[in-house]
Amino acid sequence: MTAFDSFLQKQRVRMAARFLAPGARVLDLGCGDGALFRQLTWISGIGIDPTLAHSFDLPNASVMAGRFPDDVPAERGFDAVTLLAVLEHLPVEVQRRLDEACARVLKPEGRVILTVPSAKTDLVLAVLKKFRLVHGMALEEHYGYDVRKTPELFGSFRMVAHERFQLGFNNLFVCEKP
């Protein structure tokens, strides 16, 4: 990860943090090295990522190799599920299962907090990757994701917020379970 990748990641975490209460139990999907839990030491939970070689523990979280929802423990009662720069990397058939899978693990009024890039982002990332300013992690996996479809993917949830950030190249969505 380049310094610029790290900067962008920290911005995504800061955007999500505004919607997480102190002490929140969070399930972080596509957690990578556990950056959300490393940055936000006042939350706890579980991180899961299919790219991890092995599972490990942080002071405030267990981070495990695996895929959601199949490999997540049968725990329920999370205050939030986060997908920061993850949704656009998921195949369409997995995206379609997220609403039900997230609802199953969340408390009533629990939140799905996610960031997804705008359509124009892929072109900019491709240029930045060419100049080695970003790694463009799995850029080829964006599946042509259309950010406008995000609300319908979480149709059983109430949309709480939609904000653009990073000069309009990124979007934050917050959906609440009824």
Q: Which residues make up each language-model segment?
A:
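A short glycine-rich, Lys/Arg-flanked "PGG" loop and its adjoining helix->strand segment in the class I
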Residues: 96-108
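Short catalytic micro-motifs in class I SAM-dependent methyltransferases
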Residues: 85-89
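Short glycine-centered segments of the SAM/dcSAM-binding site in methyltransferase folds
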Residues: 25, 109-111
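Feature marks short, surface-exposed loop/turn motifs that line or immediately flank catalytic pockets
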Residues: 54, 90, 120-122
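Helix-to-beta-strand junctions that scaffold the AdoMet/dcAdoMet cofactor pocket
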Residues: 21, 90-91, 106-108
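Conserved N-terminal segment of class I S-adenosyl-L-methionine
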Residues: 1-76, 80-82, 96-99, 136-149, ...
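Conserved class I S-adenosyl-L-methionine
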Residues: 113-134
